[in-house]
């Protein structure tokens, strides 16, 4: 056998089904081959391959260097057992995973567990695994950063259609991983005295942490590539040709990880690294493109867009490698998927058989990867006036699946793709218009000026996956944590934080304190022994009062910093818009469930303006949301329960645009008592005429137009929005206070004390001044107050402040204008019963006194007849019963039943 035949045989054993055709004549005959202008100059060539297999024509398939004719037969047989699908190595302990990324449609083969180890010529005695195996060329392998003279020639090989040189890209990125330091970043360049960590090798440290923690994802800041001088070209190539550069970076990570092991590493550690599939996830591009600005020039390039997640599909199995078996002879063959297409074998490749149309797809032997489609929409703040928001489809794969939920504000980095659309699903004729989508390689959630999502609303597996794989903006550094802990020890931290919340709004201290505690929130609890599986820790607040009292401004400020917040108006919202609605998917034509405002706000705060303008049908769905924090949907055959674990901040205007202090709150706002009672705090914001207060308010507003900082605030009195959100996020994520025994006793005493406010000296008038909902609200507010002080135990002072806030709110909105006393009957009982005119009650009391003189009694029916006779207007029986009940509660009369008749007696006659 000749040397060329042995070399070809070796190549066939290494990569079955791929021929060796990388001769010099084939290279010189390439249409892209340019002869050098001088004999000593470098020639630029593009390697050509044969089309023996569907994948052999790919521009990224290069054949590894031939092992030569003098390979021992034992080495060949061992290589055969590793590479051929029909032979299994008895020493292998685990099945390797698919080495192809779902987000990168590249035919570059990633490293496998059975990679052949080669000796690094620069480091004798150190065994390093070989790099990518390419078919159809004698190009260098990825592990050979310094090619030997035997293989190197005077040509520069680039990937077809690009200016990407594989060896140059490997060397450049390897040098970046090994040499990039913090001092190259822009924030370190302007420092006269660089900090101690300026010489830190950022990515070497990250790779070491990945090996220790067993991670496979490296988040690459693209700006680091740009500011590192040797990799500026690689930065532009990554932007223009991400499909070719990212697989090279993936393999380089594994090679550097192997280099970091040092001399003679343990075999188990070496095998563990070989079995892992390392992936690079670039982010932080220089420019974030608007969705409506995407154009055909961005196709197959790396882009970055921001938006709001509207819908996430279930996990879709995406086939990566198809397994076919001949139904005649049983011969098996695997075919890799290229951009969603399967090159199904027409005939059996076995020469002995050669049966046509006999290859069957075996699903349980095929390889699948996780895939999910996300619908991303423009955020309302970037939509131009008079236009509807644009949306784009995102395809996420592998670890990024289920990393984003409906309602998340995310920034994604990915490759802009386009695919043809068939004119008819059963025909291959396609339209001239292409459908576009984004293959996501990185997801960055939230905003620096927004709070972090409540971790208690995340499932444990999703939260763990997000913590490991997703780059969170709201990660707080150690320096910020130290500053937060120092600030929390200040005695006036409560006042400073409340002033920092909407500092442009004058005073309203108690309202701001209530909103501040709403942002911190209570603790969500689940008791397996309790009647309810979950007790809410979210706080609901309603602001009602006169117009032009800054209610809407407060809502917008809270919406800007609230996590997963949705801002909506009562008049422009419907029941399905708040909960969920059924729509037909444009791709699958199936009915899908779209999330509404309350479901999108899961784990955040939903701000509803003009709450009183809502229709009754829309308000009725809020009863379940505000107490059970779920939304039950039964539409079009879809029956499900969605989570709506959200705090509600609402504002309402009174009837007639002016609050009447002579009427109770239910008569002023036109809200049902059942809905009003579900708010933890109800604040009345009234526009009272006061010359001194008006002058101070006017001076404050004028000063806001003259300077950005309020007149009464200094740098030490008001925190910035970034620090305020960092403080609240740290408290929400790390502090889970527990009620102490002293605090529990104080809660009981405060509740009993609030109930005693309804007692009268005559011990017969029973006004409701507190219910168990006030007790639960007190618990939530006290937990939020403890969170604000970064305490893990609720103390007595927290309970006292919570009780003070509740009493202050109740004093304003639950005071009976007729008696001037606090009575929750105005809210919890029927409206007609509580709104009986006081003069009618007095007239009935006088009539009873006159008719029961001398200890006489009177039937209720007779009393109603006499009362109607002297009344000038038609008197309903319900109004009469309401007056009778009011007199009985006040201790004026007593109604008894005797022989089936109701009898009225004066209370003075019964004592």
Curated annotation (Swiss-Prot):
EC number(s) per entry: 3.6.4.12
Give the matching InterPro entries.
Answer: MCM (IPR031327), MCM_4 (IPR008047), MCM_CS (IPR018525), MCM_dom (IPR001208), MCM_lid (IPR041562), MCM_N (IPR027925), MCM_OB (IPR033762), NA-bd_OB-fold (IPR012340)
A single GO CC term for this protein reads:
rDNA protrusion
Please state every residue range assigned to the domain named MCM. Answer: 493-702
- Binding residues annotated for ATP, in chain numbering: 545-552
Q: Which residues carry this modification: Phosphoserine?
A: 37-38, 41, 92
Looking at its record, which EC class is this enzyme? Answer: hydrolase
* Gene3D superfamilies, sorted: 2.20.28.10, mini-chromosome maintenance (MCM) complex, chain A, domain 1, Nucleic acid-binding proteins, P-loop containing nucleotide triphosphate hydrolases
Localization in the cell:
Nucleus
Q: What residue spans carry the Polar residues bias annotation?
A: 63-84
Return the motif ranges for Arginine finger. Answer: 677-680
UniProt GO molecular function: ATP binding; ATP hydrolysis activity; chromatin binding; DNA binding; DNA helicase activity
Keyword Flavoprotein carried by entry: no
Q: Which UniProt keywords apply?
A: ATP-binding, DNA replication, DNA-binding, Helicase, Hydrolase, Nucleotide-binding, Nucleus, Phosphoprotein
List every stretch annotated Disordered. 1-132
Which PROSITE patterns would you find in this protein's record? MCM_1, MCM_2
BP GO terms, sorted: DNA replication; DNA replication initiation; DNA strand elongation involved in DNA replication; double-strand break repair via break-induced replication; mitotic DNA replication initiation; nuclear DNA replication; premeiotic DNA replication
Comp. bias intervals (Low complexity): 42-56
The record's note on quaternary structure and interaction partners says: Component of the mcm2-7 complex. The complex forms a toroidal hexameric ring with the proposed subunit order mcm2-mcm6-mcm4-mcm7-mcm3-mcm5. The heterodimers of mcm4/mcm6 and mcm3/mcm5 interact with mcm2 and mcm7.
Q: Which family does it belong to?
A: Belongs to the MCM family.
Which purpose does this protein serve, as stated in its record?
Acts as a component of the mcm2-7 complex (mcm complex) which is the putative replicative helicase essential for 'once per cell cycle' DNA replication initiation and elongation in eukaryotic cells. The active ATPase sites in the mcm2-7 ring are formed through the interaction surfaces of two neighboring subunits such that a critical structure of a conserved arginine finger motif is provided in trans relative to the ATP-binding site of the Walker A box of the adjacent subunit. The six ATPase active sites, however, are likely to contribute differentially to the complex helicase activity.
Q: What is this protein called?
A: DNA replication licensing factor mcm4
**Species whose genome carries this gene:** Schizosaccharomyces pombe (strain 972 / ATCC 24843) (Fission yeast)
């Amino acid at each position: 056998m000749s040397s060329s035949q042995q070399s070809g045989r070796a190549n066939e054993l290494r990569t079955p089904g791929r021929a060796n055709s990388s001769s010099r004549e084939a290279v010189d005959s390439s249409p892209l081959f340019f002869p050098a202008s001088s004999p000593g100059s470098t020639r630029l060539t593009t390697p050509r391959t044969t089309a023996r297999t569907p994948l052999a024509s790919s521009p990224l398939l290069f054949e590894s260097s031939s092992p030569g004719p003098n390979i021992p037969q034992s080495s060949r047989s061992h290589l055969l057992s590793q590479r051929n699908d029909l032979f299994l190595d008895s020493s292998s302990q685990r099945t390797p995973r698919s080495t192809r990324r779902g987000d990168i449609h590249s035919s570059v083969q990633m490293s496998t567990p059975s990679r052949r180890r080669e000796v690094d010529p620069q480091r004798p005695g150190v065994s390093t695994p070989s790099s990518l195996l390419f078919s159809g060329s004698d190009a260098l392998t990825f592990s050979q950063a310094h090619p030997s003279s035997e293989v190197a020639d005077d040509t520069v090989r680039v990937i077809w259609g690009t200016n990407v040189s594989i060896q140059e890209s490997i060397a450049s990125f390897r040098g970046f991983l090994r040499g990039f330091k913090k001092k190259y970043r822009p924030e370190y360049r302007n420092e006269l005295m660089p900090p101690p960590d300026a010489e830190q090798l950022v990515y070497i440290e990250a790779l070491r942490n990945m090996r220790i923690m067993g991670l496979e994802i490296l988040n690459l800041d693209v700006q680091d590539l740009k500011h590192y001088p040797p990799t500026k070209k690689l930065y532009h190539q990554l932007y223009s040709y991400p499909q070719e550069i990212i697989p090279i970076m993936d393999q380089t990570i594994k090679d550097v990880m192997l280099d970091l092991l040092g001399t003679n590493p343990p075999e188990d550690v070496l095998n563990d690294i070989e079995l892992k599939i390392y992936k690079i996830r670039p982010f932080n591009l220089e420019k974030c493109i608007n969705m409506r600005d995407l154009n055909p020039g961005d196709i197959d390039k790396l882009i970055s867009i921001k938006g709001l997640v509207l819908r996430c599909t279930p996990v879709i199995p995406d086939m990566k490698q198809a397994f076919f078996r001949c139904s005649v002879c049983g011969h098996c063959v695997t075919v890799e998927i290229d951009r969603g297409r399967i090159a199904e074998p027409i005939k059996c490749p076995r020469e002995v058989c050669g049966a046509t149309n006999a290859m069957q797809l075996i699903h349980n032997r095929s390889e699948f990867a996780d895939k999910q489609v996300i619908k991303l929409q423009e955020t309302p703040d970037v939509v131009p006036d008079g236009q509807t928001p644009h949306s784009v489809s995102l395809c996420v794969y592998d670890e990024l699946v289920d990393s984003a939920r409906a309602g998340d504000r995310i920034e994604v980095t990915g490759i802009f793709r386009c695919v043809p659309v068939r004119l008819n699903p059963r025909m291959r004729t396609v339209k001239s218009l292409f459908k576009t989508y984004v293959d996501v390689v990185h997801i960055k959630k939230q905003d620096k000026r927004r709070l972090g999502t409540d971790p208690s609303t995340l499932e444990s597996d999703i939260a763990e996956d997000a913590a490991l794989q997703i780059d969170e903006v709201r990660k707080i550094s150690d320096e910020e944590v130290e500053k937060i802990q120092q600030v929390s020890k200040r005695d006036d931290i409560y006042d400073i934080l409340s002033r920092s919340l909407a500092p442009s709004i004058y005073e309203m201290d108690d309202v701001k304190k209530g909103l501040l505690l709403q942002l911190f929130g209570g603790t969500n609890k689940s008791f397996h022994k309790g009647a309810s599986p979950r007790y809410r820790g979210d706080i609901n607040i309603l602001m009602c009062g006169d117009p032009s009292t800054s209610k809407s401004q407060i809502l917008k400020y809270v919406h800007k910093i609230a996590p997963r917040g949705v801002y909506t108006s009562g008049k422009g919202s419907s029941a399905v818009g708040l909960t969920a609605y059924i729509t037909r998917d444009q791709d699958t034509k199936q009915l899908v469930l779209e999330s509404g405002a309350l479901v999108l706000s899961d784990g955040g705060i939903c701000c509803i303006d003009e709450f009183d303008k809502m229709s009754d049908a829309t308000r009725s769905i809020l009863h379940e949301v505000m107490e059970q924090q779920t939304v039950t949907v039964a539409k079009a055959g879809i029956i499900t329960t969605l989570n709506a674990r959200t705090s509600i901040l609402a504002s309402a205007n009174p009837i007639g645009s002016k609050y009447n202090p002579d009427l109770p709150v239910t008569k002023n706002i036109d809200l049902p008592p059942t809905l009003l009672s579900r708010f933890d705090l109800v604040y009345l914001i009234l526009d009272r005429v006061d010359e001194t207060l008006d002058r101070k308010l006017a001076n404050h507003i004028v000063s806001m137009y003259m300077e950005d900082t309020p007149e009464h605030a200094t740098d030490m009195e008001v925190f910035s929005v970034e620090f305020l959100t960092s403080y609240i996020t740290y408290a929400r994520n790390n502090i889970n206070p527990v009620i102490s025994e002293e605090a529990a006793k104080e809660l009981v005493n405060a509740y009993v004390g609030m109930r005693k406010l309804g007692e009268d000296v005559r011990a017969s008038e029973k006004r409701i001044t507190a219910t168990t909902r006030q007790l639960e609200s007190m618990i939530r507010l006290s937990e939020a107050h403890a969170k604000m002080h970064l305490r893990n135990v609720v103390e007595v002072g927290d309970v006292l402040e919570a009780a003070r806030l509740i009493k202050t709110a109740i004093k304003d909105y639950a005071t009976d204008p007729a008696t001037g006393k606090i009575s929750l009957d105005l809210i919890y009982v029927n409206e007609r019963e509580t709104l009986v005119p006081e003069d009618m009650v007095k007239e009935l009391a006088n009539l009873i006194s006159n008719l029961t003189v001398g200890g006489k009694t009177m039937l209720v029916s007779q009393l109603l007849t006499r009362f109607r006779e002297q009344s000038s207007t038609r008197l309903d029986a319900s109004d009469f019963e309401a007056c009778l009940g009011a007199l009985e509660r006040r201790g004026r009369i007593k109604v008894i039943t005797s022989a089936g008749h109701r009898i009225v007696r004066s209370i003075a006659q019964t004592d």
